[in-house]
A protein has these predicted regions:
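Long, well-structured alpha-helical subdomains associated
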Residues: 114-189
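Auxiliary, metal-adjacent structural segments of Zn-dependent hydrolase domains
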Residues: 1-67
């Protein structure tokens, strides 16, 4: 793993965030021999940039907001770098990650349960699910894996995934409405 920190990031990077970045990078074997510049951003949770020079990759940069950084954000930005690789030497690879924010969220969640610590930003889901993300995280991850498999034969796999997520939210709501909210005790006079 080759990481270069920008001067701004050197000033702000906490040990926790540095360990999170290294742990996340270990789950991206495609980036193992690549120098990745890690910078700081104030405006967004994160961003990723792949710079090309004369048709080949010159630099790969991710920028993160250190305060409150999550594995999901780090994984999402690293997945963007892999999407950028698709335009270079990997362009003939059949299993490349398609470009786009929703696709990036789907492939990030499917990669490893580590990246399920926070709800994805771009995949549509009910607010209730986002608020109670830990209850749904692993099930949504399984749906993301299924959507990637479905992609080979079904072009609207993202629409399918978002519909399944919506159904999942409704199912859990119905299950909770059937069960009593509080136990009742018999009233004896």
């Amino acid at each position: 793993m080759l990481i270069r920190l920008t001067p701004q990031m050197k000033q702000r990077l906490t040990r926790r965030a540095h360990e999170m970045i290294e742990h996340s990078l270990a789950l991206f074997p495609e980036l193992q021999d690549t120098l990745i510049t890690v910078g700081y951003t104030r405006k967004h949770l994160g961003s990723a940039t792949v710079i090309y020079r004369k048709g080949s990759i010159d630099r790969m940069i991710i920028r993160l907001k250190v305060r409150g950084v999550t594995y999901q954000t780090i994984g999402h930005e690293l997945t963007h770098l892999i999407q950028g690789l698709a335009h270079g030497a990997r362009s003939a690879a059949p299993d490349k990650i398609p470009s786009g924010e929703k696709q990036c969220d789907i492939w990030t969640l499917a990669r490893d349960p580590l990246f399920c610590d926070d709800a994805p930003t771009y995949v549509k889901m009910p607010r209730r699910m986002r608020e109670r993300w830990p209850d749904y995280a692993l099930t949504v991850r399984e749906l993301c894996i299924a959507a990637i498999q479905k992609r080979h034969t079904y072009r609207q796999y993202i629409r399918w995934l978002e519909e399944e997520i919506r159904k999942l939210s409704k199912q859990s709501r119905q299950a909770k409405s059937i069960a009593p909210a509080q136990l009742t005790l018999p009233f004896i006079i």
